[in-house]
Amino acid sequence: MARYIGPKCKLARREGTDLFLKSARRALDSKCKLDAAPGQHGARRGRLSDYGVQLREKQKIRRIYGVLERQFRNYFAEAVRRKGSTGENLLKLLESRLDNVVYRMGFGSTRAEARQLVSHKAIVVNGQVVNIPSYQVKAGDVVSVREKAKKQARIVEGLALAEQGGFPSWVSVDSKKMEGTFKSAPERSELSSDINEQLVVEFYSK
């Protein structure tokens, strides 16, 4: 399955919520009618079956993190193998992706932009360039912007916006150095309550 590169509003309307695909700090334009399905004359949403609700939640989470279907299934399989809550394990794996950590540290204003920075070798982990967006960052890892990329306007602007909104508690960021430390994968209580990972567990348990 190819990565979706079409209108972000269309995806948000399909899921009925802002997925923050355009920016975590700016809400979608008011013209994006989240209560209607995609299309010029998007119909109001009908009642979904239990399966439909579970599928929509799985798609919503997958799209928030920008993960392809096969990758998402692999993350779920790994979450099952680990001790503890499968749903929470899944979110920790997604939050530990390098592109997501770069986004959380404010080096990219969206996860898509952060993924591009990683792919273009603009990000360093523990002193080594890493260009794999799915790379799993570990507690204590230091993530920084490569020296030659520090003057990129999108990074400077993204970091300024992130500073205004504040950084998540599970990362510490030195904005002047454009460097941050991944303290640990976040606890469930630190993440958005708009996500219901248990529905994903139920979806794959059928």
UniProtKB/Swiss-Prot annotation:
- Cite a GO CC annotation: small ribosomal subunit
Keyword Ribonucleoprotein in the entry? The reply is yes
Instruction: Give the SMART domains listed for this entry.
Output: Ribosomal_S4, S4
Among InterPro entries, the record links this protein to: Ribosomal_uS4 (IPR022801), Ribosomal_uS4_bac-type (IPR005709), Ribosomal_uS4_CS (IPR018079), Ribosomal_uS4_N (IPR001912), S4_RNA-bd (IPR002942), S4_RNA-bd_sf (IPR036986)
Residues covered by the S4 RNA-binding domain:
96-159
GO MF: rRNA binding; structural constituent of ribosome
Q: Which Pfam families match?
A: Ribosomal_S4, S4
Q: Which UniProt keywords apply?
A: Ribonucleoprotein, Ribosomal protein, RNA-binding, rRNA-binding
Task: Name its GO BP terms in alphabetical order.
Answer: ribosomal small subunit biogenesis; translation
Q: Say if the entry is tagged with keyword Transmembrane helix.
A: no
* NCBIfam families reported for this sequence: PRK05327.1, rpsD_bact
The UniProt family comment states: Belongs to the universal ribosomal protein uS4 family.
Note the PANTHER family from the entry. 30S 40S RIBOSOMAL PROTEIN, SMALL RIBOSOMAL SUBUNIT PROTEIN US4M
Stated role: One of the primary rRNA binding proteins, it binds directly to 16S rRNA where it nucleates assembly of the body of the 30S subunit.
Subunit structure and binding partners: Part of the 30S ribosomal subunit. Contacts protein S5. The interaction surface between S4 and S5 is involved in control of translational fidelity.
The protein here is known as: Small ribosomal subunit protein uS4
> What is the name of the gene encoding this protein?
rpsD
